[in-house]
């Protein structure tokens, strides 16, 4: 069972308004945790390692580092695929600095199941999910960007490789952007296949473009939901921190 006790991580709950609007949801027989963020109001960040190069891996070390700057996590989840040493597999941009380059070739595994894509937030807070080859051709200036794959929804269409009755069901998380610019983080709390997860993003969450992030190491930190999931170390972490003052 996933541990969801903030106290176990030494993370207190401050009396303040959450930056993310997070709710548990149910769609047919499947349960989800969904958080909606206005990227023009809240700063979505990517985190990987501290100043010494040590990968955070979990929410507690990241929160300890944020505390030194007067901040605390409000929302976070694993932010993309990574190598065994937890380096990002594809494009990774944090604070406007590219750490890893974009990968546009077809390859093994979910990441290489084209089309894959990039979640990008630019310097004025506009967020987009962009197909990887279109991203490479456009080369937008992103304040943060993370590449993953496959795309779940591409311009309103499900990824063509998804099979409705597939028995490959896992806990999964992903990110999408609505037509009004709001960013939607979603985590499946019951195992789902790609087709079901993508359909949920398109039809229920109303995101015409959405990106799969991970399907094995899937965890959520949500102050509003009282969750700080524990488990194996992660690579990139995506989310929102807020000031504790």
Which residue stretches match the model-derived regions?
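Residues that act as N-cap/strand-start positions at coil-to-secondary-structure junctions
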Residues: 29, 113, 146, 169-171, ...
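Short, solvent-exposed aromatic-acidic interface loops
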Residues: 49-52, 133-137, 187-191
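Active-site-adjacent helix-turn-beta-strand microarchitecture at beta-sheet edges
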Residues: 87-162
């Amino acid at each position: 069972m996933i541990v969801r006790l903030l106290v176990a991580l030494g993370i207190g709950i401050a009396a303040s308004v959450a930056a993310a609007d997070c709710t548990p949801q149910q769609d047919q027989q499947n349960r989800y945790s969904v958080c909606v963020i206005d990227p023009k109001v809240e700063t979505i960040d990517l985190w990987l390692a501290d100043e010494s190069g040590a990968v955070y891996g979990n929410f507690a070390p990241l929160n300890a580092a944020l505390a030194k700057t007067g901040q605390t996590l409000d929302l976070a989840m694993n932010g993309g695929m990574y190598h065994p040493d937890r380096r990002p597999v594809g494009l990774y941009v944090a604070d406007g600095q590219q750490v890893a380059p974009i990968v546009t070739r077809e390859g093994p595994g979910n990441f290489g199941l084209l089309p894959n894509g990039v979640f990008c937030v630019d310097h004025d807070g506009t967020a987009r999910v962009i197909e990887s080859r279109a991203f490479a051709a456009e080369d937008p200036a992103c304040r943060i960007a993370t590449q993953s794959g496959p795309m779940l929804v591409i311009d309103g269409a499900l990824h063509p490789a998804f099979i409705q009755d597939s028995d490959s069901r896992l806990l999964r998380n992903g990110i999408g952007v609505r037509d009004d610019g709001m960013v939607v983080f979603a985590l499946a709390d019951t195992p789902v296949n790609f087709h079901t997860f993508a359909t949920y993003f398109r039809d229920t969450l109303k995101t015409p473009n959405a990106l799969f992030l991970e399907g094995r190491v899937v965890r959520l930190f949500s102050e509003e939901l009282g969750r700080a999931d524990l488990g194996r170390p992660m690579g990139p972490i995506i989310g929102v921190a807020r000031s504790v003052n």
